Each structure stands twice: as C-alpha cells, then as structure tokens.
C-alpha cells in the first residue's frame, strides 16, 4: 500500500493507494482511502518526525495491507528495522533521518477519552502529563456524542493541564466506523510528540483488556501478539507505551475516580450529554451496576429497570461469556440479587467474590515507562493499594471456561 502525506494550513492529510489484492478483507473493511488530522494552523510538517508519520499510518491501515507500506517520505533505518520484526516492510529508508530523541523530551502524552479509565490514568500520571483528545468530526446521523468529553477537557484546562483537542477523522477509514486498531486513538499524540516535547504515550487500557481477565482465561500480556507486534515499534520510534492502568480493573478505575480530584469529570457513556449518561447502553449498565455495588452511587430501582429494558443490554447479557464478565460478577456478588431477574442468581454465581479487582496488579509495573514508574506506583497505591502475592496468583489463575461451559445463556423474557 502506498501512503501519501501532505499538509496545508495545519491540516495533515493521509492518502492511501492500494495494490493488487488490497485492501484485504477482515471483520471490518477499509471504506475510505484518506483521512486528516487537524492541528493548529501554524503546525508545520517539519515539526513532525517522519517515523511518527509512518507509525500513525501503520495504526490507520494495519488490518488491510499486505505487509508493505511505501511512504511518500523517508523513515529512519531504526524504525524500518522495528517494522521488519512485525514482518512489515516500510520504505523508503532515508539515512539522513535521525531517530527521534525522546531522552531529551520532558512530558508524557495521554491519549485521553474523557471516560473513567482514561481519567483514572490521568489521576495517577504526573501533573505535567499532556492529555490529547481525538475529536471525531460529526458526520451524518450517529448516536455518538462528544459533549461530555469536550466538557471534561475544558475543565482540565481550567485546572492547569496542557490539554489539546485534535480533530481527526481516521475512524471513517473503517466500516463499521471505529478505530482500525486499539492504539489508533493515540495518533494525534504521536503526531504532536515532537512539537510538544513528548517522550512517551500513555493509554487508559485496563486489566480486563490487557490480561484478558473477564474473558475465558488469563493471558500474560508480554506473551501476546499485541505486545510482540506493537511494544517494540513504539519504543523504536522514540515513543514508548505506558499502561498506567494496565494492572487496574474497571473496578479499580471507578474507585480511583471516586477519590481523585478530577474523577467527577469522567463520563464513560459516549451517547449521553454532559453529566447525563444515556442510561440505555451496555457501558451505562456495566458502570451503573459497579458504582452501586461500590456505594459510589445509591441504588435506583427505576434506573436499573430501564437499563434492563434496553435491547443492547439484553443482547449483551445473553452472551457466553459476557463482555467484562468479571466486573459484573464482582458487582452482583455485592448486590441483592432478589431485586434482579431470577436468572441473575445462577448466571453471576461464582465461588470467588473477586476482591482482588479492587486493588492493583503490581506485575504490570513493567508496562509503565521507567521515567514515571515510581510516581505512578505511589499514586496507584495511595488510591487502591496493591494485591499481595496470593491475590496476584488468583488473578493469574483466572479461568472461566469450565464455568461458562455449564451455564445456559441468560434469558430476560
């Protein structure tokens, strides 16, 4: 695949030209052959490191090309070698391109969404962290609402954070609309790294996603293809990844937000308005049940009834396993199930109340950049404490497969 990059009045445009047998077919399709990233009008292409443009392109089209990206600019040999380890050829290599020097940079950038996990990440990162929000432009009819996230960014700016809102339509490349890869929301941070003096990029990814807790079995993240594919290429581009919440469950991020001075700004629902979640989507159901179980918000029978009438919620609850099942087991083990449909007792029964989800899985410390690791560790422990050796073994022994095999799908009819 050919990648052409140009800039005009602070707007960086990526154009993609496919070769034979491209774009390859996946669960999603490549619906558009271009996208843009809109920075300040004074932004110049010379302020973007070539390796960062190439890394951004890789994050935009990774699912759909056949092992070769041919750029309209040269990249460093170091970056090209890192891509070769992913079995991807990136060309041309320009011997005059010096790798990005993150050692002299000062700040960590956070791919910020405004949700609970992202806000918890910001709560444990240094106060000099730069939150960067990818602002998806409105296109046609959509349930998506960014009002709450933009409100959060505005409030954080008032508190002294160096926040940036970057309009970017890379999600429109994909059909159905969404991020091509799970790290694509970091593209604005990557592209602004040189201009903003950023030495690394942080994501609000949580324990459930990183270690597959809540799915069928625990997986050691450093042994996954995700780690093997992405960790090195980010590091070799001079922007090592940090997962400050990688050892924290959704349970822990809610607890952090309930204690953090900025936690009240978090809103995970992307369909509601400011301070008014839609209370109809799956995320609202999961977060509401958890917050009630943690006594962060009071029980509300009327709200729960409304959530259980949602078609989306009912569909999700009928799955085996349910997405983030461990979080729901934690929540319902602390709620009066007599107040819920009768099938909940069997569906969410578990021999373990999963108390360890309230605390930090400290084995994840290696996924936090060494320059901020001690600070982040202290902040996490001050909010939720750390699991002991026995609890960490219980995390590593998570296996939900036999339990799922003997269960029947939950029916709410």
Regions found by a protein language model. Name each.
Residues 1-15, 56, 60, 64-68, ...:
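Nucleotide-activated chemistry modules centered on ATP-dependent adenylation/adenylyltransferase
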Residues 113:
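Conserved adenosyl
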